[in-house]
Amino acid sequence: MKLCHFEAGLDQPLFLISGPCVIESEQLAMDTAGQLKEMCAGLGIPFIYKSSFDKANRSSTKSFRGLGLEEGLRILADVKAKIGVPVLTDVHEDTPLDEVAAVVDVLQTPAFLCRQTNFIQNVARAGRPVNIKKGQFLAPWDMQNVVDKAREVGNDQIMVCERGVSFGYNTLVSDMRGLAIMRGTGCPVVFDATHSVQQPGGQGATSGGQREFVPVLARAAVASGVAGVFAETHPDPACALSDGPNAWPLGMMRELLETLKEIDALVKQRGFIEHKLMKA
């Protein structure tokens, strides 16, 4: 699949979607985008910058949601123009999709909204590639129905993203079989390595997380076979205004990417023998 300036798929090198969870300031956006671009260029990893103008699903109304649509889009447009990278942001049911699609390169749908038919189809109609996050409550094979809804309105530039499965209260687990199953949709599969270690609502009014396990799950996912990795990052996760406990430190990102790139090259060179046994 053609995605921004590169090809994305199981037969293509790993790509990265990364950035702070939420747009905190223009300076932070520019700094992180610039550093990530430099890292990825040095490693030969295609890169899409991600950050949100509004986090509508925060645990509490007291939590920071973002800078809002107008200011957020202005900053994303500046990142795109001045840093020279494609940008992705998430949208919601009340988002003016045409306005957002005029600025960003990729639209992302939140996991909680993956079953909302009208929403998925409206986003797909906006004319941009879409990264559809699988709900924490959804079986991997049920993503075929979600993809079909998006394709029905004429959008073939669809990615599916695994971000963990609810496992009791305040806990997520990652079933790597789901990555192989979702390949059956014919869409590039992305693994969200940072939200997969989130502990939703685990700190009462905020979510917790176990960022120390980000590389563990990222290595496992890339070894299983994915088109891309999604990993939110922050120069100082302890001070991040959203999802800090599961954000990967920016200063440690290059080391992680080096490992993932090596694993990706090996498994894609060898191929995926499981396809001989899985139903088409």
Curated annotation (Swiss-Prot):
GO BP annotation list: keto-3-deoxy-D-manno-octulosonic acid biosynthetic process
Pfam families in alphabetical order: DAHP_synth_1
InterPro entries: Aldolase_TIM, DAHP1/KDSA, KDO8P_synthase
Xref: Gene3D superfamilies: Aldolase class I
Subcellular location: Cytoplasm
Reaction catalysed by this enzyme: D-arabinose 5-phosphate + phosphoenolpyruvate + H2O = 3-deoxy-alpha-D-manno-2-octulosonate-8-phosphate + phosphate
GO cellular component, one term: cytoplasm
Keywords, comma-separated and alphabetical: Cytoplasm, Lipopolysaccharide biosynthesis, Transferase
Domain of life: Bacteria
Transmembrane segments: none
Enzyme class: transferase
EC number(s) from the headed UniProt entry: 2.5.1.55
Chief subcellular location: cytoplasm
Record pathway: Carbohydrate biosynthesis; 3-deoxy-D-manno-octulosonate biosynthesis; 3-deoxy-D-manno-octulosonate from D-ribulose 5-phosphate: step 2/3; Bacterial outer membrane biogenesis; lipopolysaccharide biosynthesis
Protein family per UniProt: Belongs to the KdsA family.
Protein name as it appears in the record: 2-dehydro-3-deoxyphosphooctonate aldolase
Organism: Thiobacillus denitrificans (strain ATCC 25259 / T1)
